[in-house]
């Protein structure tokens, strides 16, 4: 009797064992999907991981069905799942759920998209027979018109004897009905006469049109060519290379040349981007060159589309290039040769909730090593960890210090808004310098971007008389005002509350919004520049599938000229006519209670500043802050990444933070705050007995209650080189001990490894 270990799509640790019936032995191999029972009545699609003869000590149920003829998961993917589960301390079932499209986990069989085609019956495929067919329908005018239209569309009307002069073209039933303006009944009548017949073809849901045109790849500039050669040289010695190139230096063009080289060597490429918005612009550039060799994969695609991409990657003719966001790292590859991670510093590459809380950059580097492939990290503002690894010689380093075609870096003007408010010179959140710059840009037919990293109308509303602030009933946060839907909304759980007309505490009607989000910026700037064509890019305006494409296309083509947005607008977007960028509130990024605050603020401001000044014109950035003398502000103005790095590095070394130490955040959650507090202290005491002063906490996080669950956080600082396996064994043991205590039956414990 054979047995198989499987992963179930449930948040459960480890694998489960089932017996393999005799008739299935040759079909059950690692990587195939199996239908298995669980409990009394439930059935799941499980992933086979290991076939063996080791009879378990317990009675196990048999596999009910094998759903694949060939594996849906390749060995390298299986190893990646196991690494993610181990390193990020996530149940394998959670990894399975994150990795596989829903259609491959459903008991309902995936249905390919079919199209109905119309064809001429074989009886009438000669010149003489066609005349007979036309005579048959000459009195049925609609049928005659439809048949004539079909013969023209399909080229059957160009017979030379019994052979068409042109190749026969497939005609869909829909196309025939549209061109002949007929109904389905007319087509059916021609079928009933035996003149036409219909058949189905799988057409797929993906746009695979377009041949590749590698000849359209532009030649590199001297600086780009030097960087390209440097990357190839470094890749001869290192598995991972960091390309540190200033904004607008033409890194994408270098990527395209590297992709071409990989394709010529019959290798596949994985090109990761942090945001779906970025894939829209890059996709157009890559599609012009690589055509149907390019596949796109991200969460805005339907489940059926993602299944089709997955299955194509397993076919004999997979995509040569996959462009995608975080989840694309899970796709199957048969011959992966190069991984490109653009904007590698972006926090969007880190999955937060739900588990697994993996970092796509780290996962992609591990995946590349499994294939013997090379990894290129590209950015204008490297993460501290990546730059440190490059400085230490673990990664190769190539620098590109000039913008493409000699375009200057933007001029950055720092505006002290505290001083301007004191002198009553501010117009809401706008300084006179910013308004003047935007006015000039619009007057000259240029465009402007206003950056505010907070969506909604106002972060909170408050009673002016008694100070009452409406809070979420499920979370420990104030509600955000969204004026467009006239609701107060929680950005953590989605709870909504009507905008109050009077204070429930004191009865006052003086209730007003505090602070400003992108929605309020949009309202106020429209009052100042009524002639401006304004667009807003944030989570609220990009929920639908094509929203990104529409917003970016409108701005690129000049249908809008003033773009307001959150961090989405900072991520590598390329707009020719943007001459002004306004950073409305630098302090909101700088004052965040996190050791990475200055690093992230510098990256955000440097990236959004890089959107200004392209195609031969120097841009202008207005940076508004209450603290103009902070060192990080000067570093942004001078584009001094090295200064930022050296300053922060010493602090990190002194206080035991990355890149010198690894962090693991341990979260304890419970419905009752008292139980949460007690359990977190007990867990912390246990961890301290093993890890000593490496353990900090427990503390309440910035938001200590989410979706009715109270939260405590314990931080563990682990020096580089420590035995990671031992650490994980200790943590799992401590969690198991807590689980045995009847007081903590409903307690949740989870981990965030290398948190951002």
For each of these PLM feature ranges, what is it?
Residues 1-379, 391-407, 690, 724-756:
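Accessory, non-ATPase domains that flank or precede helicase/AAA+ motor cores in DNA-metabolism machines
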Residues 50-52, 100, 200-202, 452-454, ...:
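A general secondary-structure junction signal
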Residues 685-710, 731, 749:
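A carboxyl-terminal module marker
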Residues 215-221, 225, 237-677, 685, ...:
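Inter-lobe coupling/hinge segments of SF2-like helicase ATPases
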């Amino acid at each position: 009797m054979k047995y198989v270990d499987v992963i179930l799509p449930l948040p459960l640790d480890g694998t489960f064992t089932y017996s393999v019936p005799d008739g299935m032995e040759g079909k059950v191999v690692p990587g195939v999907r199996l239908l298995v029972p669980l409990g009394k009545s439930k059935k799941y699609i499980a992933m086979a991981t290991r076939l063996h003869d080791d009879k378990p000590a317990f009675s196990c149920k048999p596999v009910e069905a094998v759903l694949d003829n060939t594996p849906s998961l390749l060995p390298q993917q299986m190893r990646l799942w196991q690494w993610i589960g181990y390193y990020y301390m996530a149940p394998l079932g959670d990894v399975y759920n994150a990795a596989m499209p829903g259609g491959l986990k459903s008991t309902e069989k995936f249905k390919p998209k079919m199209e109905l085609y119309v064809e001429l019956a074989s009886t009438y495929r000669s010149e003489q027979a066609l005349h007979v067919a036309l005579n048959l329908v000459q009195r049925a005018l609609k049928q005659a018109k439809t048949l004539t239209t079909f013969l023209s569309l399909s080229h059957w009307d160009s017979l030379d004897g019994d052979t068409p002069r042109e190749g026969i073209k497939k005609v869909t039933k829909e196309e025939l009905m549209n061109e002949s303006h007929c109904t389905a009944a007319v087509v059916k009548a021609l079928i009933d006469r035996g003149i036409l017949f219909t058949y189905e073809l799988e057409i797929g849901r993906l746009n695979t049109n377009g041949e590749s045109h590698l000849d359209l790849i532009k030649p590199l500039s001297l600086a780009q060519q030097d960087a390209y050669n440097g990357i190839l040289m470094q890749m001869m010695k290192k598995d991972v290379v960091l390309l540190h190139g200033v904004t607008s230096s033409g890194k994408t063009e270098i990527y395209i040349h590297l992709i071409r080289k990989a394709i010529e060597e019959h290798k596949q490429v994985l090109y990761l981007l942090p945001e779906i918005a970025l894939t829209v612009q890059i996709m157009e550039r890559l599609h012009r060159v690589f055509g149907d060799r390019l596949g796109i994969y991200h969460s805005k695609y339907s489940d059926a589309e993602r299944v089709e991409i997955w299955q194509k990657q397993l076919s004999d003719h997979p995509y040569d290039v996959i462009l995608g966001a975080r989840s694309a790292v899970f796709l199957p590859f048969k011959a992966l040769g190069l991984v490109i991670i653009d904007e590698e510093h972006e926090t969007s590459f880190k999955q937060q909730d739900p588990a697994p809380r993996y970092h796509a950059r780290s996962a992609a580097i591990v995946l590349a090593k499994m294939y013997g492939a090379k990894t290129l990290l590209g950015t204008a503002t490297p993460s501290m960890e990546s730059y440190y690894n490059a400085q230490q010689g673990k990664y190769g380093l190539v620098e590109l210090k000039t913008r493409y075609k000699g375009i200057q870096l933007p001029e950055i003007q720092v505006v002290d808004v505290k001083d301007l408010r004191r002198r009553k010179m501010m117009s809401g959140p706008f300084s006179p310098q910013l308004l003047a710059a935007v006015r000039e840009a619009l007057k000259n037919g240029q465009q402007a971007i206003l950056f505010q990293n907070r969506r909604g109308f106002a972060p909170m509303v408050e009673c002016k008389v008694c100070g009452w602030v409406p809070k979420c009933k499920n979370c420990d946060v104030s509600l955000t005002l969204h004026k467009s839907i006239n609701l107060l909304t929680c950005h953590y759980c989605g709870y909504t509350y009507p905008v109050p007309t009077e204070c429930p505490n004191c009865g006052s009607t003086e209730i007003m919004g505090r602070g400003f989000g992108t929605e309020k910026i949009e309202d106020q700037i429209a009052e100042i520049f009524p002639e401006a064509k304004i667009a807003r890019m944030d989570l609220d305006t990009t929920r639908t599938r094509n929203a990104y494409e529409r917003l970016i296309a409108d701005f690129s083509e000049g249908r809008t000229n003033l773009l307001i947005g959150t961090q989405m607008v900072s991520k590598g977007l390329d707009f020719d006519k943007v001459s002004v960028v306004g950073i409305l509130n630098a302090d909101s990024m700088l004052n965040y209670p996190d050791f990475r605050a200055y690093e992230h603020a510098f990256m955000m401001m440097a990236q959004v500043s890089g959107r200004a000044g392209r195609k031969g014109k120097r841009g202008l950035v207005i940076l508004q802050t209450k603290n103009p003398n902070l060192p990080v502000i000067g570093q942004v103005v001078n584009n001094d990444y090295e200064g930022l790095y050296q300053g922060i590095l010493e602090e990190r070394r002194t206080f035991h933070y990355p890149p010198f130490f690894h962090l693991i955040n341990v979260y304890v959650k419970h419905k009752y705050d008292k139980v949460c507090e007690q359990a977190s202290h007990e867990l912390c005491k246990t961890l301290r007995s093993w890890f000593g002063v490496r353990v900090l906490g427990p503390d309440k996080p910035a938001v200590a209650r989410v979706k009715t669950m109270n939260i405590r956080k314990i931080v563990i600082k682990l020096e580089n080189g420590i035995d990671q396996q031992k650490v994980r064994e200790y943590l799992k043991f401590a969690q198991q001990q807590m689980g045995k205590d009847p007081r903590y039956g409903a307690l949740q414990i989870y981990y965030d490894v290398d948190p951002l």
